[in-house]
Curated annotation (Swiss-Prot):
Keyword Coiled coil: yes
Ranges for region Disordered: 1-195
Family: Belongs to the MISP family.
Pfam families linked: AKAP2_C (PF15304)
Source taxonomy: Eukaryota, Metazoa, Chordata, Craniata, Vertebrata
Protein name, as recorded: Uncharacterized protein MISP3
Residue ranges with Basic and acidic residues bias: 1-20, 30-39, 156-170
Record keywords, A-Z: Coiled coil
Length: 219
């Protein structure tokens, strides 16, 4: 059976011969130059090489098993090894109550140092709660004075607000010209038919018109 490629080659050769005859040329030897090529299909290709001998397969499986056993032994040894002790954590900071008592005791000992020269060595509480002697190296050690009081940020803000409020009150008194200035308070009037009170702000002021006290009406 002729394949498509062989058919195409045959037709090409026939066209070439017809062209040579039409032009008076000697017939070529194209048919003689054709070479037959034998092609093997993919299914006929040789498969994988011969199987390994049984002894070689056993040796390779034994080596793999030996590696697995050694890996498991190393893992078991690492688990059985005692863990490294963790570094000791730092002691927690002393509570504020103990520090306060320590500073108070130090301040008290500093004030009574002159009166108690003939007395024995005084023992001051440490921040950890253990008493310690106030005499070190043959000389008396005075307790450290408590740190100076510094107002917190909140107290500073409150003080600044109070100062601003006092300054505003002084300015209002200077503007209104009386020392008995009072803050205006909202007035409650029943201006609706249902009897409910309505808050009017700012409150109505009484102004003088033609010598008569009248109430200022605002739309």
């Amino acid at each position: 059976m002729e394949t498509p490629i062989e058919r195409e080659i045959r037709r090409s050769c026939e066209r070439e011969e017809s062209l040579r005859r039409s032009r008076g040329l000697s017939p070529g030897r194209a048919g003689r130059e054709l070479v037959e090529l034998r092609v093997r299909p993919v299914l006929n290709l040789p498969g994988p090489g011969p199987a390994l001998p049984r002894a070689l397969e056993r040796a390779r499986a034994g080596a793999q098993m030996q590696r697995d056993i050694e890996r498991e032994a190393h893992r078991q040894a690492a688990l059985a090894r005692p863990a490294v002790p963790e570094p000791r954590a730092r002691s927690p900071p002393q509570p504020l109550g103990e520090l306060k008592r320590f500073f108070e005791a130090a301040a008290g000992s500093g004030s009574s140092a002159g009166a108690g020269d003939g007395a024995g060595p005084q023992r001051l509480p440490e921040p950890g709660g253990r008493p310690r002697s106030a005499v070190q190296g043959g000389c008396r050690v005075l307790g450290s004075a408590p740190p100076p009081f510094t107002p917190s940020l909140l107290e500073q803000e409150v003080r600044a607000v109070r100062e601003r409020e006092q300054e505003l009150q002084r300015q209002r008194r200077s503007v209104y010209g009386t020392a008995e200035f009072k803050e205006p308070t909202p007035s409650l009037t029943a201006s609706r038919g249902d009897g409910k009170l309505v808050v009017i702000w700012p409150p109505r002021r009484k102004v003088s018109e033609n010598g008569l006290e009248q109430e200022e009406r605002k739309p």
